[in-house]
Amino acid sequence: MDMITLFGLALALAMDAFAVALGCGLTLERLTGRHLFRLGWHFGLFQAMMPIIGWLAGLTVQKWIETYDHWVAFGLLVCVGGKMIHEAFQDEETRESRDDPTRGMSLIMLSVATSIDALAVGLSLAIVGISVWFPALIIGIIAGVMTVIGMLLGRRAGARWGQRVEIAGGLILIGIGLKILWEHTLGM
């Protein structure tokens, strides 16, 4: 695989991570270096691991994964997006104690949801006989960088527009989930 194709693939895979990070940046009261590192590291790591897992699985589980991957991504994104919208309507005291999307189960759910497409890429690489190791590294690095950029842009917008942007962040996640479901069920 040539470098231009690889970078194009990595950027395409990073778009979901970027959009989700944008939504996360919108919801955080105060964005710290730890938030940036945690989300960037996890999204990058999951984006790098999933092609490797898909490549190792090869053809044996391809049909099963293709049948359910979009439902898993949809469910995870709708749950987290719905939670973000719900939290936007809470009073100020409750909002301060809410879950941080860069920690715990929210972090794991978002990491899995944004990297499922990379699993399919790994399967595809196995089918055409391309080694996965270098592409996985590039995919992970670009996803991590795009995640940090998304969080920074989201935080900037969140500081300016507050609750409305927080609701938009949840709607973005739900929209991404619906897009994934739409593309996979209708084959678009």
UniProtKB/Swiss-Prot annotation:
Keyword Ion transport set for record: yes
Record-linked InterPro entries: Mntp/YtaF, Put_MntP
GO cellular component: plasma membrane
Keyword Phosphoprotein applies: no
Transmembrane segments: 3-23, 39-59, 65-85, 104-124, 125-145, 167-187
Top-level lineage group: Bacteria
Family recorded in the similarity comment: Belongs to the MntP (TC 9.B.29) family.
Function: Probably functions as a manganese efflux pump.
Protein name per the record: Putative manganese efflux pump MntP
Gene that this sequence comes from: mntP
